[in-house]
Amino acid sequence: MSTPLEPIEQFLNNPGITYGAHGNFGYVHDFAISPEAFLSFAENDLDSGQSHKDINALSNAKRAIECQMECILKAFTLFSSRITFPEKQVILTKIGLPASTMLNRFNKIRNDLEHRYLPPTPEQARESVELADMFIRSSRNYLDDFTSYFEMENSETGKKICFDINHDSTTISARIIDSSYDSLNDYMNKLPATNTPDSLIICQQPQAEYDRLLRLFGFHMLRIRRRTFSDKRKWHL
């Protein structure tokens, strides 16, 4: 049985597609305390001299990581107060962010404290703070320059696909249109309201198709970001 996403997936499976225009913006969270602030608390805890400094440092390192996770989830319109720490890690991994490898070690230390009530050693506390710092640094760029719109073109078919994420309506959309149009806005402005693209899907959380479309969006968004970062490095060499 075909699904609404099938034309989109078939388009993306074509080896002849190339990346085109994309739009970025700086995503700003609305939390009263930032991930960087929690990280600063954790660093101060390590040097506090208190008997429970390692526990405090680990706890604030966890808050720093989780706050950063939730900032990213909000950027992808996936935030929910009911999602647990491990579930957040799984979601970020599905999107394609490098969360698992970095956080698996942290989870072991965190679980020992939160579920076995074993205090961290000074070395474990310092490692946890360092892991939190690494995670925030490695993922910050995704928020400072978040890709919310991008296009991919197939020169053989003369078609392009336009991905767009809308935070106001909590939706992700994908449209296949003719490559003769400069952009999705150009397409929307020039066609009568009765016309539709070759394929259109708009998924809203928690619709079943949303997770699949989000994975496609995240995968190709990260590929665009890696290519852009590589181009910037070449430019500076």
PLM regions with names:
Residues 1-54, 144-148, 161, 215, ...:
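Charged alpha-helical initiation segments
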Residues 25-29, 48-59, 93, 97-100, ...:
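Short, solvent-exposed segments of well-ordered alpha helices
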Residues 27, 41, 72, 125-172:
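Amphipathic, Lys/Arg-enriched alpha-helical patches that create a basic surface
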Residues 41-48, 85-87, 114-115:
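Short, charged/polar, low-complexity loop and linker segments
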Residues 43, 53-74:
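Short, hydrophobic, well-ordered secondary-structure elements
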Residues 72-99:
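Short, charged amphipathic alpha-helical segments flanked by flexible coils
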Residues 98-149, 234-237:
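Charge-enriched, short contiguous segments at helix-coil
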Residues 152-232:
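N-terminal accessory interaction module
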